[in-house]
Each structure stands twice: as C-alpha cells, then as structure tokens.
Amino acid sequence: MAAVLREGDELIMHLMIQPKASRDQIVGLHGEELKVAITAPPVDGQANSHLIKYLAKQFKVAKGQVRIVRGELGRHKTVAIEAPRQIPAEVSALLDNQG
C-alpha cells in the first residue's frame, strides 16, 4: 500500500495523525503512511476538523474538497482530496517515487 495515490482527479492519502503537536506539519513517511502532526487535541472531533482545515490550506482547496474516508475515530486515517491545486513538497516527492 502506498502512502499517497492518485485516482483520477483525487489524491488519496493514508495518514498517521499525531494530535497535540507543537505545530502543524507534514512530517514525512512513517511506515506505509504519511505522518501529519497537528496542534488540536483528539477531543470531540477537534483533531478531525483541524486536520481538514490544515490539509485544505496546504493543498489550496476548499474544506469541502477534503474528506475523511476511513478512520474518523482513530489516528490512522484515509483522506481524499478532490482536485488539489497545489501539492506540498513532502507529498509530491512520494508521488514522484512511485513511478
């Protein structure tokens, strides 16, 4: 399983989330997942909404174009981003390495 896949105009990412981090950042590859650190705590969906907002900003899309496909209640998530206008360097490098 690749951490980042392209399916048509969607980008599918398998993420490992680190909540309550000191800052928001895409850390890099962690096993077969992309590790993302976010400052929000994992309480009452705060981490999920913060993750969606952060990813929307990084990929320059509306929040409605980012959805959690799987793993809403855990640290391991599958996220789909519809028609990203920008791809951060960390993610772009993973896509380039796939072939």
Swiss-Prot record:
<dbReference type="InterPro" id="IPR003746">
    <property type="entry name" value="DUF167"/>
</dbReference>
<dbReference type="InterPro" id="IPR036591">
    <property type="entry name" value="YggU-like_sf"/>
</dbReference>
<protein>
    <recommendedName>
        <fullName>UPF0235 protein AHA_3661</fullName>
    </recommendedName>
</protein>
<dbReference type="GO" id="GO:0005737">
    <property type="term" value="C:cytoplasm"/>
</dbReference>
<dbReference type="Pfam" id="PF02594">
    <property type="entry name" value="DUF167"/>
</dbReference>
<comment type="similarity">
    <text>Belongs to the UPF0235 family.</text>
</comment>
